[in-house]
Amino acid sequence: MERIARKAVKKNAVAPEPRVIALLLVVCGLSGCGIASRIRGAFEPSAEVADQGYSRDDELRLNHLQVKGTHNSYHRRPRFALVREHDYEQAPLDVQLGEYGVRAVELDIHPSSRGYEVYHLPVIDSRSTCALLIDCLGVLKRWSDSNPGHHPLFVWIEPKDELGGGDFDMDALDAEILSVWPRERLVTPALVKGGRESVREAIVEVGWPTLGEVRGRAMFMLLDRGRQRDAYLRGGKGPGALDGRVLFVHANPVDFDEPFAAVAKIDDPSSAHIAAALEKGIIVGSNVGSALLSDERNIQKLQAGLRNGVHLLTGDYPAPVKGRTYWFDMPGGSPSRCNPITAPAGCASTDVEAPGILRGRTRPAGG
């Protein structure tokens, strides 16, 4: 049995040509990538899902990607920004997906009598392009329906409760997601787990699903490092903690061997924990491109994330903005690219996703 951690760096790896990102030269690091061996898993695509036209869909897996994402993806600039870190604005979600090549988003949710509201902070930073979670989910789903050839969308959900009133109703959260995205259109813990004892065991012994098995889907992840995460796990970390659940949950570094460990948000793209996570097949997200930081510092963070194989690179600037020279456009992406650490040899960005066949040949099952 070959473990998922196994990889070999190609000899004579060649650095890609530097790419100018809004007048600043960003060298993205080595394109030479590791060869991550996988055992063919028990993930069989639904009979209703036709070939989308990608020749390596039965080989490339979900953790072979490097994806452009946005931080606080719903965010609108406050009318009066009191602090610099709030002074930015994101385009509507469908514009981010369709025009900017974003494939990973973050949504902050707050419980209310209307359902889950989506915004950053009460009063001082509360403007949003989609006021309710169900609205945001609908925007993402409609875009996906129209573009079934996309690789999975990654959606971080961060529960926020400023009053500290207790745990979220996690069953209600699952139900709200399922009211828009049916299970057959999701990458769920159950899909990854298959017949194995736990998600972790499946990732180690089988690997993530292939892209062909999960095109046109979305993958939801709970971004919480403590109480709300534990509530979603029903207070336990055993093999069955995610049974029936819709979302994966963030794994802290001390949790990387726990049965639920599959995704991790490691804010610092230079962290040594990233390499440890990649060795275990964990999908990693990091923050790059903050409104709070200088253009120079943002470039440094982006370079580190690209070079270190972070899968989901999220930031405040997915497109050029007035007053800043930094913005993030994936080097060599179409719009995503092959991960420089985990993808197999010969992987091309158009194997991951290609604009010319984004609309696919048929709609995925459950559309």
Language model feature labels by segment:
Residues 21-27:
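Sec-dependent N-terminal signal peptides
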Residues 35-367:
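Catalytic cores of phosphodiester-bond hydrolases, prominently lipid phosphodiesterases
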Residues 10-21:
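Bacterial N-terminal signal peptides that target proteins for export
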Residues 31-32:
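C-terminal motif of bacterial Sec signal peptides marking the signal peptidase cleavage site
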Residues 1-2, 14, 354-356:
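Coiled-coil-like amphipathic alpha-helices with heptad-repeat character
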